[in-house]
Design a protein with these regions (language model features):
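Active-site-adjacent structural elements in enzyme catalytic cores
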Residues: 1-180
């Protein structure tokens, strides 16, 4: 994608819009994690259970200083994209959703990393209504969401062998719970 596309994505997000874009794994619907109205728009468009949290994508571990080492370690050592669940610290209610933890993932996708470096962390649930399978291409995403999404960014077809990220929680004793 061109610099113009990057600018279009960041402008859309900064103005409260939501964007369907390929992540490290599958297509996601992204919105600024700091924008409550945009986050709620994603929930409405996906018809997502309001009590379910979304993974927060970050460009680097310094975005979460209290847990930077843990997030960095698992992002670098796991072979597949891995979201790490850590205790919530000062995240807003529209992110924690009544819970006491948050899942963060350092993105590997270069375009998405550039976007996040410019606008800050984004939520990124899969690009599908709650009861449907994730979109594997932009045409499927458009069928699901139509004009309710502000911008679609075509990242090609997602191979059937690619699935959503692994989600882990590191327990106080150092053992790992594989949540997905």
């Amino acid at each position: 994608l061109t610099a113009n596309s990057l600018e279009q994505i960041t402008t859309t997000l900064r103005s409260g819009g939501i964007v369907v874009i390929r992540t490290d794994t599958i297509y996601g619907i992204i919105a600024l994690a700091t924008d409550e109205m945009a986050v709620e728009k994603v929930y409405a468009v996906k018809q997502r259970d309001l009590s379910k949290q979304c993974i927060v994508l970050i460009a680097n571990a310094s975005s979460v200083p209290a847990h930077a080492e843990l997030i960095r370690h698992y992002s670098e050592t796991e072979k597949i994209p891995t979201s790490v669940v850590v205790p919530a610290s000062n995240e807003p209610e529209w992110i924690v959703r009544g819970g006491d933890s948050v899942a963060y993932r350092i993105v590997r996708n270069e375009l998405l990393k550039q976007v996040i470096e410019q606008v800050g962390p984004v939520i990124a649930p899969s690009a599908n209504p709650e009861s449907k399978t994730p979109a594997r291409n932009i045409a499927e995403a458009k069928k699901y969401f139509g004009d309710s999404v502000d911008l679609y960014v075509d990242g090609g077809e997602v191979p059937r062998t690619v699935h959503a990220s692994q989600i882990i929680r590191v327990k106080p004793d150092g053992t790992i719970d594989h949540l997905r």
